[in-house]
Amino acid sequence: MATRSRGVNRRSLRRWVRRGLVVAAVLALIPTMLTFLYLPSFVHPVSTLMLKDLATFSGYDRRWVSIDDVAPVLAHSVIMSEDGQFCFHRGVDLGELRGVVDDALAGEATRGASTITMQTVKNLFLWSRPLGSVRKVVELPLAVFFDAVMSKRRIMEIYLNIAEWGPGIYGIEAAAQHHFGIPAKQLSRRQAALLAVTLPNPIARNPAKPGPGLRRLANLIERRAGRSGAYVGCLE
C-alpha cells in the first residue's frame, strides 16, 4: 500500500513538473514574440507600468515620438547617466555585473548594474515587484536576446518612450511637455541632463524643481554628455 502511495506521489510530482515547464515555456515565448513584433518603428510598445495604470483606471500621459524628433543631447545624457557602455555591450555589462557579484560575495553593499537594455526589457515584459531578485535573473537572457534582435537606436527609441518621468508621465515627449512646456526636440543641454538624472527615481525627483543634489548630478552629466563622443556613436 505504501509503495502504491509513493508511486502515485511520484506521478503527481512529474505531472506538476511537466505543467510547470509548459507554463515556463509559454512565458518565455511571450517576450520572444513581442520582441519581433516591436521591431518596426511604426509599432509603439507600452510598458507594464502603463498597463497597470490602465487596469487601475489611473490613466497616464504618453506621446510617442520618433528618436529623430528628440534632441540628441537627451539620449547622450541618458547614456552617460544610466549606461556608459550602452554602445559597446551586448545587452548586459559584464564588467559591472562582475563587480556586483564580487561585492555581494564580499558582503558589501552592491551597486546597480542594470543596463538601458535591461531596463527596457524590464519595463516591457516584467513587473518590478514581487519578483525581486528572480526578475533580475530573467532580465539577463531577455536583455541579451533583445540586444541581438534590435538595433541600438531602436532600443533607445523604445526606452525613451516608455521610461517613467513622474507619476503617470511616460516617455520623453510627455516629460518635456510636462516639466518644461516644450517638445522633446527643443530640450537644452541643461534640461536634458536634469531629465536624465531623474530616471533612477522619477517619483521623488523633479527635473523642473531640482534640489542641490540633483543640480550637482545634472552638472556632472551635462559635462559628460558634452564629451560623450564614441560612447554615443551607435545612435548616429
Swiss-Prot record:
Signal peptide: none annotated. It is a single-pass membrane protein. The chain crosses the membrane at residues 20-40. One of its GO terms (molecular function) is peptidoglycan glycosyltransferase activity. One of its GO terms (cellular component) is peptidoglycan-based cell wall. Its EC number is 2.4.99.28. Its main location: membrane. Keywords: Cell inner membrane, Cell membrane, Cell shape, Cell wall biogenesis/degradation, Glycosyltransferase, Membrane, Peptidoglycan synthesis, Transferase, Transmembrane, Transmembrane helix. It catalyses: [GlcNAc-(1->4)-Mur2Ac(oyl-L-Ala-gamma-D-Glu-L-Lys-D-Ala-D-Ala)](n)-di-trans,octa-cis-undecaprenyl diphosphate + beta-D-GlcNAc-(1->4)-Mur2Ac(oyl-L-Ala-gamma-D-Glu-L-Lys-D-Ala-D-Ala)-di-trans,octa-cis-undecaprenyl diphosphate = [GlcNAc-(1->4)-Mur2Ac(oyl-L-Ala-gamma-D-Glu-L-Lys-D-Ala-D-Ala)](n+1)-di-trans,octa-cis-undecaprenyl diphosphate + di-trans,octa-cis-undecaprenyl diphosphate + H(+). GO terms for biological process: cell wall organization; peptidoglycan biosynthetic process; regulation of cell shape. It is found in: Cell inner membrane. Gene3D superfamilies: Biosynthetic peptidoglycan transglycosylase-like (1.10.3810.10). Pathway: Cell wall biogenesis; peptidoglycan biosynthesis. Pfam families: Transgly. Belongs to the glycosyltransferase 51 family. Peptidoglycan polymerase that catalyzes glycan chain elongation from lipid-linked precursors. HAMAP family: PGT_MtgA. This is Biosynthetic peptidoglycan transglycosylase. It comes from Mesorhizobium japonicum (strain LMG 29417 / CECT 9101 / MAFF 303099). The lineage of its organism: Bacteria, Pseudomonadati, Pseudomonadota, Alphaproteobacteria, Hyphomicrobiales. The gene is mtgA.
